[in-house]
Amino acid sequence: FALLGTHSTRLMLFECVDGGLLRPLDWGRTAYLPDDLSEILKYKGKTSAAFTHMMMNCARAASDFALADQPLTVLDPMCGKCTTGFVALQNGMNAVCLDIDRKDLKEAADYFSNYLQFHRLKHRLAQSSRTLQKTPVPIAEYTFSDTKEHFAADDVRTLMLAEGDSGLVG
């Protein structure tokens, strides 16, 4: 049931106690990163983060990986400004985001760098390039964690932003 509970938005959870009073219940932290990660960046044509979150949880629940202990990796071959990647990171997954539009990827990278700094999350950024079918593909790979302790213990997540044509992969 806990997995099904991730499909919806919940605002508060209470139990009824003596005299009809409501006592707030703690349902535990389910998000790896705060919900604002996929919500702050606004632009025309943006995919709904709430819809993406629901679809990602439906796909995971229907898969053989529903109860996997290790983080999954989500591939978004036409990421735009990375809404799907950011939702994956919120859910504690890794993300590989590919797009042909350099401007969109730069905006996503700048936003994520600022987000990590603002929230004081420990991270590393590695810039590299790979060649796919004789075409150079610039890559920015962020390695980060939700806490300093997890980062020190190498319990990290990654966001890989790659500029290129998804038709080259495969």
Region annotations inferred by a language model:
Residues 1-10, 16-170:
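Class I S-adenosyl-L-methionine-dependent methyltransferase catalytic core
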